Amino acid sequence: MFSAYCPDLLLGQCLTDVARTPDFIVRWTFSGRTSPYILQTYCGFRVTHEGETILTQRMLYTRTDFDEPLTDANRRFDHDVFRLTSLLPVKIVGVKCSNTNDLILCAENHLRIEIFADAPPVCEDWRFGPQDDVRLCAFTDCVHLK
């Protein structure tokens, strides 16, 4: 049953969209030779392009500069994520998952997505699966279907 939800299924698929939800979950949408897959991250991540960091988990949150209007601060992520989405779609050519559920996705245009499973063991780090059934849940010390 895990094989239907294995992150290795992303190999050869295209990352087509990245967005955040109101509760700060980042949704990575992949499509390709099979139905669309969704990777939802709740933990730290870093996206680099040709060695330069272009997006991180920290960029999700409102900046702490109190001189900046709140509405502008909340739009900051949309500005930062545009640097990434302007490089899409991009084909995934490498997938690595460590025994602690850190996940690394490498794309053909030198784009690299590193997801760090750094939440406490009782909290989900990331979730993966087909678009209509995102059930594979990764914790720092285990993976299971919900």
What are these regions, as identified by a protein language model?
Residues 1-146:
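Surface-exposed, interaction-prone regions used to assemble/regulate multi-protein complexes
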